[in-house]
Regions:
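Short helix-initiation/N-cap motifs at beta->coil->alpha
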Residues: 74-84, 204-208, 301-317
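Extracytoplasmic/periplasmic substrate-recognition and gating elements
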Residues: 155, 338-420
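Short, solvent-exposed loop/beta-turn-alpha elements that line the ligand-binding surface or hinge
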Residues: 119-138, 185-201, 248-282, 354-368
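Conserved N-terminal structural module of periplasmic/extracytoplasmic solute-binding proteins
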Residues: 5-9, 16-113, 125-132, 185, ...
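Extracytoplasmic/periplasmic solute-binding protein
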Residues: 147-165, 169-171, 205-272
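Conserved C-terminal helix/tail region of periplasmic/extracytoplasmic solute-binding proteins
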Residues: 419, 423, 433-520
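Hinge/lid segment of periplasmic solute-binding proteins
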Residues: 102-170, 185, 346-350, 358-362
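Glycine-centered hinge/linker elements that transmit conformational signals in sensory
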Residues: 210-213, 254-306, 350
């Protein structure tokens, strides 16, 4: 595993609207009581209760049983915190000590609303390789992404957040069903994919994926081959698009198209010409080949045009689809449904596209994983217990506590440790183990961040214009997928057609404004 290649998903330029309401109570601030607002999805609250009790017990030299929720600490679950943090961080009277959220806007930094965490990063914690500062123990590039200029054009920088979890985004599959499917397609597959005439492993290439689609149709034509959603969920196709794009374009260095730059060169946002990368068109072409035929969605749920990603993942958990786009949280979110179905689910790597960049042998496709590491923890400037919150961040960043969080939640923390070493690993589900294997057995990672440039040279367009939230500037994923029904990838990305303005033409207009705004 290449920890030096471990980066954060750069969705940090997003604006935070002021929303009405709060968490569970107005009683947030209290001197001496640690208050944490957190996003409740995925991992629950038990691990936070555990950390708060054990941390505060150590601070107060008492037993964890003596630490009481509501008295010594307060946890506030807020499902709107991702886009609603401003109602906390702008309030001097209702500001928590710590926020754990999926996103943090860099626009809050020059406003002085986020406390610096350099002292936290420079504190030593225990690891299996001796004491290390958190800055050393965390992924270098993760630290860099959460270090920005105080404001564009100013001198001086500080680290403003701690990375919290690393979420591999990929394809889950129903292993119970997969191993019942006979291989009858004429498409050749790897010899290790089939045993006694039936599938025994997930497809490793797009060719094998197409083969099992045909086999699944012959086995049970009521079974949906690929679970995704067009309504509030088409963006999940980014998992496929980014992986196939990087495989054709090259990860750090150009692969098939030397004059166009690599995948990571795209995120430098050097000019509108980045949207002409052919690898991105190749990825769209592959999506179209798998999911669209005769201007209709195929290999998908019959009602995909009306489905949300939650509906798609629920149907997948019920055993109605063979594959589905999801993340490491899938099993926990749909635990009761999975238990009722009695079926086994696993996570697989996105199958390699033809012509993908290879390992040193020149034949085997590079094992790439697309990661979401935008989840972070930060201390608002108006917090009344800043030191307590910072000490809590230090406490949770030791290797033992990274392992403890993995044991309790199955989550992977973005630090230099192996979650498979946690004490509960042997009792973990095959799904969680497959997520760990996907993550730790990767040759490289894909995130939406310009890792080919130093932090001080990152474009202000990337930092402040929210460009990392969507690869296709000016078009959402539903528009892209709907347009793919009757347009070519090149028409979508570069040429346009009729009333459809290409992504490139939209970017030309945007770059004109950005150059004026930032003096580029």
């Amino acid at each position: 595993m290449k920890f030096t290649k471990f980066l954060l998903l750069g969705a940090i330029g997003i604006a935070m609207p002021l929303l009405a309401g709060c968490g569970s109570s107005d009683d947030i601030q209290k001197e001496g009581r640690l208050s944490i607002v957190y996003y409740p999805g995925g991992y629950g609250q038990d691990y936070l209760d555990y950390f708060c009790k054990n941390f505060l017990a150590k601070e107060k030299n008492v037993s964890p049983d003596d630490i009481k929720p509501g008295v010594d600490y307060k946890l506030i679950a807020d499902p709107d915190i991702t886009y609603g943090a401003s109602r906390y961080i702008t309030s001097k009277s209702r500001c928590p000590d710590l926020i754990i959220s999926n996103l943090l806007s860099t626009k809050a930094i020059p406003q002085g609303l986020i406390a610096p965490l350099d002292d936290v990063y420079d504190t030593q914690v225990n690891t299996s390789k001796g004491k290390k500062t958190i800055r050393e123990f965390a992924m270098t590039e993760a630290v860099q992404q959460y270090t920005v200029e105080l404001a564009y054009g100013q001198t001086g920088k500080y680290s403003f957040a701690m990375p919290w979890t690393a979420i591999p985004l990929s394809i889950a599959y129903n292993n119970t069903i997969l191993q019942k499917i006979p291989h009858v397609s004429s498409i050749a597959v790897g010899s290790d994919a089939i045993s006694n005439g039936k599938w025994v492993r997930a497809p490793k290439t797009v060719t094998e994926l197409k083969a099992i689609f045909e086999d699944a149709e012959a086995y049970d034509n009521r079974l949906t081959k690929f679970g995704w959603a067009a309504v509030n969920g088409a963006n999940w196709l980014e998992t496929l698009i980014i992986t196939w794009w990087a495989q054709k374009q090259g990860v750090d260095t150009p692969h098939l198209y030397p004059s166009e730059g690599s995948y990571y060169d795209f995120w430098t946002y050097s000019s509108e010409e980045i949207f002409k990368q052919t690898g991105l068109q190749d990825a769209l072409a592959q999506v179209k080949d798998l999911l669209i035929k005769d201007e209709q969605f195929v290999n998908s749920f019959p009602t995909v045009g009306n489905m949300t990603i939650k509906m798609a993942q629920q149907s997948f958990a019920e055993g109605k689809a063979l594959f589905c786009l999801t993340g490491d949280f899938f099993e926990k979110e749909y635990k009761s449904v999975i238990e009722q179905s009695g079926q086994e689910f696993k996570m697989m790597r996105v199958p390699a596209i033809s012509g993908a960049v290879t390992k040193e042998d020149g034949e085997t496709p590079l094992d790439l994983s697309y990661l979401n590491i935008s989840s972070c923890a930060y201390v608002p400037a108006y917090a009344v217990n800043k030191k307590l919150a910072k000490d809590f961040l230090v406490y949770t960043s030791s290797e033992d506590n990274c392992l403890k969080m993995s044991e309790m939640t199955g989550a992977i923390r973005p630090f230099s440790y192996d979650a498979r070493n946690n004490s509960g690993y042997s009792q973990m589900s095959s799904f969680t183990k497959s997520v760990y294997d996907l993550f730790y057995e990767s040759d490289d990672y894909l995130v939406k961040y310009p890792r080919n440039v130093s932090p001080e040279n990152i474009s202000p367009i990337y930092l402040y214009e929210n460009v990392s939230e969507n690869v296709f500037y000016g078009c959402n994923y539903l528009t892209i997928m709907s347009s793919l029904k009757n347009l070519t990838p090149k028409q979508i990305m570069v040429d346009g057609k009729g009333d459809f303005k290409s992504v490139y033409d939209r970017a030309v207009e945007a770059f004109r404004d950005w150059r004026r705004r930032y003096g580029l």
